[in-house]
Swiss-Prot record:
Enzyme's top EC category: transferase
Protein name in the entry: Orotate phosphoribosyltransferase 1
Taxonomic lineage: Eukaryota, Fungi, Dikarya, Ascomycota, Saccharomycotina
Gene responsible for this protein: URA5
GO molecular function, one term: orotate phosphoribosyltransferase activity
UniProt keyword terms in alphabetical order: Glycosyltransferase, Phosphoprotein, Pyrimidine biosynthesis, Transferase
Binding residue positions for 5-phospho-alpha-D-ribose 1-diphosphate: 30, 76-77, 106-107, 110, 112, 132-140
Family according to the record: Belongs to the purine/pyrimidine phosphoribosyltransferase family. PyrE subfamily.
Residue positions where Phosphoserine is found in the record: 213, 225
Record flagged with keyword Transport: no
Quaternary structure (record): Homodimer.
A GO biological-process term: pyrimidine nucleotide biosynthetic process
Pathway in which the depicted protein is active: Pyrimidine metabolism; UMP biosynthesis via de novo pathway; UMP from orotate: step 1/2
């Protein structure tokens, strides 16, 4: 069955390519892998781009029907994401999203004023949705889980912009991706605006056959099990 993209996903990918947040070529990743594409959400750096980015996150969240009280953005990349998506949910999500709160952590605890490492909403006895850009080794979300657990909050899900759909390690017999690993470990859904298969579908006719072939080969080599 062919993969269908919704309008918000198409718009997200169009803008990602336009602002070069999504680029194609040959890129060395932290993992040491040579990737035929590179994704940098930090290039969504204007008011217009951020508004559209927030809309994409918000629609993905609304469609998931996930019940939560607080959006938590791990420092640093998650901080602006939590804020803009909280605002966008209030704008387009209807009455049940009007009072969604947001919070983030400091990298270093503050020992004066209000103190602590949590800024924004208190997390105790709250249902928490963690927001971030991508998930690779899952390190950031593991740290976020610890912070939220220490604050007596309950993580009910996570959302990222792009699911790369590749195995964390080629030695993993289960062949799980970072998102699948986190979902299995913590028993939560990991949502995304788009995944690599959406990118491949969207790019049909927009890139050369050679570029498309390289992405498909990369997915065949490093792709996670379904």
């Amino acid at each position: 069955m062919p993969i269908m993209l919704e309008d918000y996903q198409k718009n997200f990918l169009e803008l990602a390519i336009e602002c070069q947040a999504l680029r194609f070529g040959s890129f060395k990743l932290k993992s040491g892998r040579e990737s035929p594409y590179f994704f940098n959400l930090g290039l969504f750096n204007t008011g217009k781009l951020l508004s559209n980015l927030a809309t994409a996150y918000a629609i993905a969240i609304i469609q998931s029907d996930l019940k939560f009280d607080v959006i938590f953005g791990p420092a640093y990349k998650g901080i602006p994401l939590a804020a803009i998506v909280c605002v966008k949910l209030a704008e387009i999500g209807g009455s049940k999203f009007q009072n969604i709160q947001y919070a983030f952590n400091r990298k270093e605890a503050k020992d004066h004023g209000e103190g602590g490492i949590i800024v924004g909403s208190a997390l105790e006895n709250k249902r928490i949705l963690i927001i971030d850009d991508v998930m690779t080794a899952g390190t950031a979300i593991n740290e976020a889980f610890e912070i939220i657990s220490n604050a007596k909050g309950q993580v009910v899900g996570s959302i990222i912009a792009l699911d790369r759909q590749e195995v964390v390690s080629t030695d993993d017999k289960e062949g799980l991706s970072a998102t699948q690993t986190v979902s299995k470990k913590y028993g939560i859904p990991v949502l995304s605006i788009v995944s690599l298969i959406h990118i491949i579908t969207y790019l049909e006719g927009r890139i050369t056959a050679e570029e498309k072939s390289k992405i498909e080969q990369y997915l065949q080599t490093y792709g996670a099990s379904a």
